[in-house]
């Protein structure tokens, strides 16, 4: 009678267990590994660059159309000061933008100041501005 074909016999593997192999007994209790200890070093490590949580930010904007006032107002409501240069808009548009920013500054408890012929500084409540540049706009310094 013909012997039954088996893949394990074809590849030389025996179906019987190898008696030489013995399983290692498993320990009943496992020991938890201890973390490696560092040598006691008295020096302190300090980061050179630290983040400033209360860092102030001043943005500079030059609006060209009235709809640019929305992005300026968003920066103001986010707590950033904004310097606005109205050199590229006509006088009527500039007046509308200043009126809008006046309302925004009032809403956030801030203020708006003229610091140049066509330049305004809009600040939220957490900025303090000292000095008055607008009083000196009409006078020129001659040497």
From Swiss-Prot:
Family: Belongs to the SepF family.
Alphabetized InterPro entries for the sequence: Cell_div_SepF, Cell_div_SepF/SepF-rel, SepF-like_sf
Its job: Cell division protein that is part of the divisome complex and is recruited early to the Z-ring. Probably stimulates Z-ring formation, perhaps through the cross-linking of FtsZ protofilaments. Its function overlaps with FtsA.
Keywords, in A-Z order: Cell cycle, Cell division, Cytoplasm, Septation
Region span, Disordered: 16-43
Organism from which the protein derives: Levilactobacillus brevis (strain ATCC 367 / BCRC 12310 / CIP 105137 / JCM 1170 / LMG 11437 / NCIMB 947 / NCTC 947) (Lactobacillus brevis)
Taxon lineage: Bacteria, Bacillati, Bacillota, Bacilli, Lactobacillales
Main location: cytoplasm
GO annotation, biological process: division septum assembly; FtsZ-dependent cytokinesis
Pfam families per UniProt: SepF (PF04472)
GO cellular component: cytoplasm
Compartments where located: Cytoplasm
Quaternary structure note: Homodimer. Interacts with FtsZ.
Name of the protein in its database record: Cell division protein SepF
